[in-house]
A protein has these predicted regions:
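Cytochrome P450
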Residues: 1-411
Length: 411
């Protein structure tokens, strides 16, 4: 079937309203060959989950296996920067398949188990209190700048033993790294600048941690221990430290910001949350899961076909690029009743905001904890959160669903 949807995923309409764009694809051509960018676009829930469960067919080693030019095209003069970026991303543990991925993930996997994460809940609450106390002084805040960003940034920096005065630097570098999912022709410039500055910043810290006995309370120390066991090289330790710093706060930023916006647009759901009228699991747990489903922090993930494989009646050739869209799968009517409705009573909530299979998000428990505490605090403090704009501008990324600002008044 030939779809009637335009193939440019980077248009303003597709960025601002991915649910209409990819929803139409899902309805018309759920495994769609995008002719413009020469890749498969997968939009259905069951197809996405099937792919994650068949990792032997669809490789995570995208940067290693894919030798073609980037999409959209970049400035020809920046191809050297593109190769530098590719080689760097190859060192991330999420860019490996089994057994390498399993061995490398094991280095820090235990650190993120639910019991370990619970130990951080008091600190999360303390940071939230500080943020909201400051907002109370004026009765206004930019949710993105004043709440959603400082909370998870503080937490991951503390977990990794980063000096508090370096948080601003970490965030500025993370913002440059996020150009990876954007379409500007000159995007390699800020992206590679951030990689180089991050490497320069983290290398001496990793050297310091590696020279000492492992400190189980320090995530960077635990990560550095992977070099001693042979699971990681020094370059991989540094690269994974950058990954953890980035992924350790960006997903939660978008969860909190997108979720807050959803509640302002659905006052009846805000009332249910405040009144706690839901049975087990409680309203906060249900609300956080529905925020993750309704407007997920990550829109899409890319893979490359390891072998010829059939999906949705289409033949995917070895080496083909594939991009699956979480944002569409989470609104699939074949999986969710009334999928375009924000309903915090929805349970069970079988969204795929954190992926599925062996590459399920390592930090999912942490993101959930931070989201739960953020929404709980907002509901306990405020009767009304009113958005002070009618225009919502999103970062032009097909990877992340990220608002630029969210100004609100608080009463």
């Amino acid at each position: 079937m030939v779809t009637t949807v335009a193939d440019d995923m980077f248009t303003g309409d597709a960025i601002s309203d991915p649910y209409s764009y990819y929803g139409k694809l899902r309805d018309e051509d759920p495994v769609h060959w995008n002719e413009l960018y020469e890749l498969w676009v997968v939009t259905g829930h069951d197809d996405l989950v099937w792919m994650t469960r068949h990792h032997e067919l669809f490789s995570s080693e995208f940067w290693k296996r894919d030798q073609r030019s980037p999409y959209p095209a970049i400035d020809e003069s920046d191809m050297g920067l593109y190769q530098f970026m590719r080689e760097f991303f190859m060192d991330w543990f999420i860019q490996h398949d089994r057994p390498v991925h399993t061995d490398q993930r094991k280095v820090v996997h235990k650190w993120f188990n639910p019991n370990s994460m619970e130990l951080w809940r008091p600190m999360v609450r303390s940071v939230i209190k500080d943020c909201l106390d400051e907002a109370d002084a004026s009765g206004h805040m930019d949710v993105m700048r004043d709440f959603a960003t400082p909370l998870p940034l503080f937490v991951i920096a503390q977990m990794m033993g980063m000096p508090h005065y370096d948080r601003k630097f970490i965030r500025s570098m993370a913002e440059k790294l996020l150009f990876i999912g954007r379409g500007e022709t000159d995007r390699m410039q800020p992206l590679t600048e951030a990689i180089k500055e991050f490497i320069e910043y983290l290398t001496p810290l990793v050297e310091e941690k590696a020279a000492k006995p492992v400190d189980e309370n320090d995530l960077l120390s635990v990560l550095a221990s992977g070099e001693k066991t042979g699971a990681l090289t020094r370059d991989e330790v540094v690269a994974d430290a950058i990954l953890l710093l980035l992924a350790g706060h960006e997903t939660t930023i978008n969860l909190i910001c997108n979720g807050t916006l959803a509640f302002t647009q659905h006052p009846e759901q805000w009332k249910i949350l405040k009144e706690g009228r839901l049975e087990e699991p409680d309203a906060i747990t249900r609300a956080t899961e529905e925020c993750l489903r309704y407007d997920p922090p990550v829109k899409s993930i890319q893979r490359v076909a390891s072998v010829d494989a059939e999906l949705g009646g289409k033949l995917i050739r070895e080496g083909d690029r594939i991009r699956w869209f979480i944002s569409s799968a989470n609104r699939d009517p074949k999986k969710h009743d009334n999928p375009d409705t924000f309903d915090i009573s929805r349970w069970p909530n079988t969204h795929v905001a954190f992926g599925s299979g062996i590459h399920h998000c390592l930090g999912a428990t942490l993101a959930r904890l931070e989201g739960q505490e953020a929404f709980k605090a907002l509901a306990e403090r405020y009767d009304n959160i009113k958005v002070e704009t009618n225009e919502f501008e999103y970062q032009p990324s097909i990877t992340f669903r990220s608002l630029k600002t969210l100004p609100v008044s608080l009463t």
